[in-house]
Curated annotation (Swiss-Prot):
It is an enzyme of class 2 (transferase). Catalyzes the phosphorylation of 1D-myo-inositol 1,4,5-trisphosphate (InsP3) into 1D-myo-inositol 1,3,4,5-tetrakisphosphate and participates to the regulation of calcium homeostasis. The lineage of its organism: Eukaryota, Metazoa, Chordata, Craniata, Vertebrata. This is Inositol-trisphosphate 3-kinase A. The gene is ITPKA. Activated by calcium/calmodulin. It comes from Homo sapiens (Human). Its EC number is 2.7.1.127.
């Protein structure tokens, strides 16, 4: 069964209905287009200023008094300033359409988006996960270092300058669509990933993620599989600054102040071959020992205390044991709320009731969002059960990404395929059988069954 191109309530590529009748979204522009608008506007403003200078000088007396009978000139306005960083080239693929707006979603009465300082970025960026390598920490979270990526645009309140140098200070007065800033909106992209994995694409609706060959392999095959509508659209590989990046669909595009939850699926987050390599060439990790100690000082063994270090498989097995991974087949990695605050304090969230309370807090009583999440998860499960890709791959370290906003839009996607591995010819997985070393079962469907059951229980309350 092939899913539609997006979650329940999401429009197909090609455009979306406006949030409210008569309220149309301004088109997004690239940095190059913004610069052309900027130069044209500055030229027009400079010409107008030059033409108006004689009248302004003739209208004033010595001492700055305005003659009787002449209208007093209004004070110099506060002009927005536009700061454009280095431009990235446009990327040709067309981005998918934003989610469909099912209900009106207007600003609060009396508010004006023009009164607030604004920031613009040439591209929205979404979390499509990040593959974790054996020598990398599982918990390198919440990095916003990519906020300094090239191709960002910032619109801020300008200075109140005098008439003499007013036109020298102006940067632009171009009317531009407002897009959330990279740093504020996308600090959560590292909820379960690694620092520096993401980059602004320079095209709205797309994100660049540092390329790994296993993930490129998986995404290319997923685009031809029944699961295509359940994963971020893949638009190939591009080069930036000498590095290769995957060009992916921005899963936040079209959401207004999105809330995001990352749920890591499966009963384990390490490959069987990682266990083998770790036994053959064990490497001690002091950083993981410290993380273990911070959660439970009694968790390390006497030998680990003496070494003040643990191996990564040991840490990951311990972490999965204290979370819901081993018991429910999934665990909550992190949540980003609409106000931008992030939380990853879910390491010991283990029972069904604890998980239910987390989701209850996440949806904030929005029954429509909960219904959409539940329907989407059921669609994903139906598709996984008929997917040839899924039957023939060990899916490790992958997540389900939940996204919704205050307009009742909601979506769920499978993300992060850096550790998804093809099985030997002829072997298939059930994805529900218990894992024993050697059978390569990952427990993905076991976790999805439990997740659907928990959300169904929440919907009945």
């Amino acid at each position: 069964m092939t899913l539609p191109g997006g979650p329940t309530g999401m429009a197909r590529p090609g455009g979306a209905r406006p949030c409210s009748p008569g309220l149309e979204r301004a088109p997004r522009r690239s940095v190059g287009e913004l610069r052309l608008l900027f130069e044209a506007r500055c030229a027009a403003v400079a010409a107008a200023a030059a033409a108006g200078e004689p009248r302004a000088r003739g209208a004033k007396r010595r001492g700055g008094q305005v003659p009787n009978g002449l209208p007093r000139a209004p004070p110099a306005p506060v002009i927005p300033q536009l700061t454009v960083t280095a431009e990235e080239p446009d990327v040709p693929p067309t981005s998918p359409g934003p989610p469909e707006r099912e209900r009106d979603c207007l600003p609060a009465a009396g508010s004006s988006h023009l009164q607030q300082p604004r920031r613009l970025s040439t591209s929205s960026v979404s979390s499509t996960g990040s593959s974790s390598l054996l020598e990398d920490s599982e918990d390198d979270l919440l990095s916003d270092s990519e906020s300094r990526s090239r191709g960002n645009v910032q619109l801020e309140a300008g200075e109140d300058v005098g008439q003499k140098n007013h036109w020298q200070k102006i940067r632009t007065m171009v009317n531009l669509p407002v897009i959330s800033p990279f740093k504020k909106r996308y600090a959560w992209v590292q909820l379960a990933g690694h620092t520096g994995s993401f980059k602004a694409a320079g095209t709205s609706g797309l994100i660049l993620k540092r390329c790994s060959e296993p993930e490129r392999y998986c995404l290319a095959r997923l685009m031809a599989d029944a699961l295509r509508g359940c994963v971020p659209a893949f638009h190939g590989v591009v080069e930036r600054d000498g590095e290769s990046y995957l060009q992916l669909q921005d899963l936040l595009d079209g959401f207004d102040g999105p809330c995001v939850l990352d749920c890591k699926m499966g009963v384990r987050t390490y490959l069987e071959e990682e266990l083998t390599k770790a036994r053959e060439r064990p490497k001690l990790r002091k950083d993981m020992y410290k993380k273990m100690l911070a959660v439970d000082p009694e968790a390390p063994t006497e030998e680990e205390h003496a070494q003040r270090a643990v191996t990564k498989p040991r840490y990951m097995q311990w972490r999965e044991g204290i979370s819901s991974s081993t018991t429910l087949g999934f665990r909550i990695e992190g949540i980003k709320k609409a106000d931008g605050s992030c939380s990853t304090d879910f390491k010991t969230t283990r029972s069904r009731e604890q998980v239910l309370r987390v989701f209850e807090e996440f949806v904030q009583g929005d029954e429509e969002v909960l219904r959409r999440y539940l329907n989407r998860l059921q669609q994903i499960r139906d598709t996984l059960e008929v997917s040839e890709f899924f039957r023939r791959h060990e899916v490790i370290g992958s997540s389900l990404l939940f996204v919704h906003d205050h307009c009742h839009r909601a979506g769920v996607w499978l993300i992060d395929f850096g550790k998804t591995t093809p099985l030997p010819d002829g072997q298939i997985l059930d994805h529900r059988r218990p894992w024993e070393e050697g059978n390569r079962e990952d427990g993905y469907l076991l976790g999805l069954d439990n997740l659907i059951g928990i959300l169904a229980s929440l919907a009945e309350r």
